[in-house]
Amino acid sequence: MTFSQKDRKETIQETAKTTYDVLIIGGGITGAGVAVQTAAAGMKTVLLEMQDFAEGTSSRSTKLVHGGIRYLKTFDVEVVADTVRERAIVQQIAPHIPKPDPMLLPIYDEPGATFSLFSVKVAMDLYDRLANVTGSKYENYLLTKEEVLAREPQLQAENLVGGGVYLDFRNNDARLVIENIKRAQADGAAMISKAKVVGILHDEQGIINGVEVEDQLTNERFEVHAKVVINTTGPWSDIVRQLDKNDELPPQMRPTKGVHLVVDREKLKVPQPTYFDTGKNDGRMVFVVPRENKTYFGTTDTDYTGDFAHPTVTQEDVDYLLTIVNERFPHAQITLDDIEASWAGLRPLITNNGGSDYNGGGKGKLSDESFEQIVESVKEYLADERQRPVVEKAVKQAQERVEASKVDPSQVSRGSSLERSKDGLLTLAGGKITDYRLMAEGAVKRINELLQESGASFELVDSTTYPVSGGELDAANVEEELAKLADQAQTAGFNEAAATYLAHLYGSNLPQVLNYKTKFEGLDEKESTALNYSLHEEMVLTPVDYLLRRTNHILFMRDTLDDVKAGVVAAMTDFFGWSEEEKAAHVLELNQVIAESDLTALKGGKKDE
């Protein structure tokens, strides 16, 4: 069965006569992760997403699968241990998506510096031990000031004392979501985008037994019934819970906005991802990451109460990031006009004073005494003179000394929670993209327990080894496997660059992609084939779905976007049979998204439509 708009109507009709085991609200990474595991276990599963899959938070991250070294700023050892373990699992189950990309960490001797050269080496050694890369080619190492500047000549030299290099992974966040979605759909789940939940249904005993849905394409409403309903809507979690009049649990979300800006690689040349203090003594850090022929940087971390579906980049966001990056790279002199693209996303944070921070924050700093106690414990642990509980005890004692004052946006917990209301609504919230599988595993175990109470019995899969769509590759030899797939594409007539692009984008699905080889007017064969496959197998419903989330044209391929978008619109018009009015509406939406991304309004101009 294909996965396209042509199957969507039939799927919706099927929901009217089906009682599902599990109904998932939300088609970001959390909901997709739950759906993979429930469908694989044989649970009758339906997922409803009000926008495109991954359109909310899950396509707007920093696009890294973090190992979490930032958590060692407060020596949150347990968080780092969990994070690097999950990162390794994600690399196993989706080997064509996360790619190793060692991170440079320049160290400056200035007020509020996160690390000194000594403390960063201790942190990186502990990080490597937890990530199980000690002794490998990805083992961390220190650089002198001169070595750092030899790598990145544009970096600020003043107060630079050296740097460290440690293992991190780049990620294609939206592709990770769609590959999970496709796996669940292949295993029998009904996956429906542009389907907004507008009401919660209850049985005669007041227990949740379904939802009312509004089709965003037709405005028609329908009901879907299920034994278990789980809310996985990220920042929207409290909003969905408000639809349930019987939900007595207090609100738990405190979304913060993160902004990233994209410039041409020639404007900001960095050979590898770089992570540094802002230099503002505000406890925050900023990433600068090369991608395609571009460089992006971020992020901000500010409380957000606006339109969750359309967070925007403000002048204040731009000024903050440009000030920091231009000070760290003084010869770059990036201006607003240099920004080619941008994105703003919401983090689904749970308000919790005890949480580990993400991007720094002025509160909760360890005292020098506490810091030194932890360092000594870690040194002994790395020398195999102490056991891990000794380190954990030192960390716990230090954390207990940290004053629980007003919570800074950057200190709200990235931890997750799973709660069940009195009438049965499950809500899985919080977490990080790296943790999505682990979060889903905990939720699915609870779902299975609830279904067992009603007499159902399911055997859960081992989700640590269950591959996403496209991920059926040997993770230990992924580059060799992708090279072999690229050879197949070359045999099919694609040049080397196009073949490599398709292999890395689609992984083990490439042979199926090649079955969709075609040539649309205005597009080359590579783009035509990718679009044709996405229309049939990836539930692409609009040009924005394809150009922003199934591919990265809008963010990182601006040089060719104008040439590509007309051909994409024309091909989709033929595929869907759009009228001139429908085509014009899609073109308008596409141009609005592009204008928002390239900050046309802030630049004071208008794009031609």
From Swiss-Prot:
Annotated positions binding FAD: 21-49
GO cellular component, one term: cytoplasm
Superkingdom of this protein's organism: Bacteria
InterPro entries the record matches: DAO_C (IPR031656), DAO_C_sf (IPR038299), FAD-dep_OxRdtase (IPR006076), FAD/NAD-bd_sf (IPR036188), G3P_DH_FAD-dep (IPR000447)
Catalytic activity: sn-glycerol 3-phosphate + O2 = dihydroxyacetone phosphate + H2O2
Predominant location category: cytoplasm
Pathway: Membrane lipid metabolism; glycerophospholipid metabolism
Pfam families named among the record's database cross-references: DAO, DAO_C
SUPFAM superfamilies: FAD-linked reductases, C-terminal domain, FAD/NAD(P)-binding domain
Gene3D superfamilies referenced in this protein's UniProt entry, alphabetically: Alpha-glycerophosphate oxidase, cap domain, D-Amino Acid Oxidase, subunit A, domain 2, FAD/NAD(P)-binding domain
Keyword Glycoprotein: no
GO molecular function: glycerol-3-phosphate dehydrogenase (quinone) activity; glycerol-3-phosphate oxidase activity
Example of a GO biological process term: glycerol-3-phosphate catabolic process
UniProt keyword annotations, A-Z: Cytoplasm, FAD, Flavoprotein, Glycerol metabolism, Oxidoreductase
Record localization: Cytoplasm
Catalytic activity, EC: 1.1.3.21
Cofactor: FAD
Record's keyword annotation contains Transport: no
Similarity section: Belongs to the FAD-dependent glycerol-3-phosphate dehydrogenase family.
Name of the protein this chain belongs to: Alpha-glycerophosphate oxidase
Natural source organism: Enterococcus casseliflavus (Enterococcus flavescens)
Name of the gene: glpO
